[in-house]
């Protein structure tokens, strides 16, 4: 144990990192925070990616997680009207089966709400064009034409949970924004630490395109032409 700690401190002193990007999973994350504290590295200079941003990543670390930052595509907490609506119409009505109500508003719980919004609205978008009965390719079209502007988010009660979304054939992300959140170990809750921030799309998209082109070539997949309406809306998948 002593040797391992000495080695960790040696790495810290030799590399002298300003920040450390944490790309952990499961128990790796709280262990990283506890190790940072033991070696004198500020946990406030650990920045977690989306696999290191949940309540389950910080709570096991206890006080060692205080001040830890993580990126998130959606803030934690009861940040949107739709969350209050779910609490009122589902849980207070005795219809929910969530055993631990403290999970309401947690990172993964809010992600589930957001997934429900996206899937439902994409299905409705497809049904508006093709009718009530849709196949998988038509649902894909619904996702590729999903528009959630401010008025739509307001109507859904999702304002504050996610930025405006505009998914297309060319852009399956639909918005390249994220926020940073910081953990308050005393209150056991995340607090938003930034506005919506756009990543370096030019850099990331080039990497995505390169990987996609290779995958298509290796698997004999014909690339769709999103500028060609007939090819873009080809439903014979």
Q: Where do the protein language model's features map onto the residues?
A:
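Segments of small-molecule ligand-sensing domains
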Residues: 97-109, 120-193, 199
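Stable alpha-helical elements in mature extracytoplasmic
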Residues: 8, 28-32, 79-87, 115, ...
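Extracellular/periplasmic periplasmic-binding protein-like sensory domains
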Residues: 35-116
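Conserved C-terminal helix/tail region of periplasmic/extracytoplasmic solute-binding proteins
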Residues: 141-154, 184-237
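Single conserved hydrophobic/aromatic residue that forms the stacking wall/gate
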Residues: 1-11
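Sequence contexts marking disulfide-bonded cysteines in secreted/extracellular proteins
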Residues: 11, 168-170, 225-231
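Periplasmic-binding protein-like
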Residues: 15-26, 32, 43-49, 108
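Catalytic-loop motifs flanking and including active-site residues across diverse enzymes
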Residues: 25-28, 111-119, 176, 212
């Amino acid at each position: 144990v002593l040797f391992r700690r000495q080695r960790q401190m040696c790495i810290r002193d030799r590399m002298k990192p300003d920040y450390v990007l944490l790309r952990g999973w499961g128990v790796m994350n709280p262990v990283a925070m506890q190790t940072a504290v033991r070696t004198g590295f500020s946990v406030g200079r650990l920045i977690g990616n989306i696999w290191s941003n949940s309540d389950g990543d910080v709570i096991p670390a206890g006080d060692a997680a205080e001040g830890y930052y993580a990126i998130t595509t959606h803030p934690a907490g009861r940040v949107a009207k739709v969350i209050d609506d779910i609490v009122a119409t589902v849980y207070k009505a005795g219809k929910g089966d969530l055993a631990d109500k403290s999970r309401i508003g947690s990172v993964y719980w809010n992600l589930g709400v957001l997934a429900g919004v996206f899937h439902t609205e994409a299905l409705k978008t497809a049904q508006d064009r093709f009718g009530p009965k849709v196949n998988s390719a038509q649902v894909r079209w619904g996702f590729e034409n999903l528009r959630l502007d401010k008025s739509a988010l307001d109507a859904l009660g999702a304002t504050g949970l996610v930025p405006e979304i505009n998914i297309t054939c060319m852009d399956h992300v639909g918005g390249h924004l994220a926020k940073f959140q910081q953990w308050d170990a005393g209150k056991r809750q995340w607090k938003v630490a930034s506005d919506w921030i756009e990543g370096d799309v030019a850099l990331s998209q080039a990497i995505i395109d390169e990987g996609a082109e290779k995958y298509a070539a290796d698997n004999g997949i014909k690339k769709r032409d999103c500028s060609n309406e007939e090819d873009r809306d080809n439903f014979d998948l």
